[in-house]
């Protein structure tokens, strides 16, 4: 079976900051996210609504006020429920932004195992976790900062190249 047909390709402009971040209110448009995987890590903060994610064919119910983590090359799909009010923030980035090309103890011990998918990373964190609010607020700050950077750069582009 050719799994590359499920590969989702993301364009990440690494000249600015190697991260894509966007807000989604897709519940009013679609209630399924079809099977795919990608080379980048993905973090999704579900603000409203719920979803059943199938990760490597195993279903996981995720309610609002949850944060999901997908390491690179993890096969996943989803079905939304409560989709009349489904909103989320999505962050996709290449794990190379946290990796150093110079060997050091911290990279070798902590970062490399994440990049090489050798760590059992938590799949989701919900509002019952003590660190949920701090992580959620950090993600929202990253989203705001990314939006401001994109808008700032767009002001220097000719009108025909602006996408914002």
Placement of each model-derived feature along the sequence:
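Basic, amphipathic alpha-helical hairpins
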Residues: 140-150, 161-164
């Amino acid at each position: 079976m050719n799994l590359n047909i499920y590969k989702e390709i993301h364009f990440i402009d690494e000249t600015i900051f190697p991260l894509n971040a966007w807000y989604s209110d897709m519940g009013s448009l679609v209630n399924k996210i079809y099977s795919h995987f990608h080379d980048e890590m993905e973090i999704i903060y579900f603000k409203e609504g719920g979803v059943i994610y199938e990760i490597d064919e195993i279903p996981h119910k995720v309610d609002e006020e949850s944060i999901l983590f997908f390491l690179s090359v993890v096969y996943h799909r989803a079905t939304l429920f409560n989709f009349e009010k489904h909103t989320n923030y999505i962050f996709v980035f290449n794990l190379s932004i946290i990796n150093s090309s110079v060997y050091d103890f911290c990279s070798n011990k902590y970062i490399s195992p994440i990049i090489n998918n050798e760590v059992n990373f938590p799949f989701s964190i919900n509002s019952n976790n003590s660190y949920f609010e701090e992580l959620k607020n950090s993600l929202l700050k990253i989203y705001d900062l990314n939006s401001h950077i994109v808008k700032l750069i767009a002001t220097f582009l000719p009108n025909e190249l602006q996408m914002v």
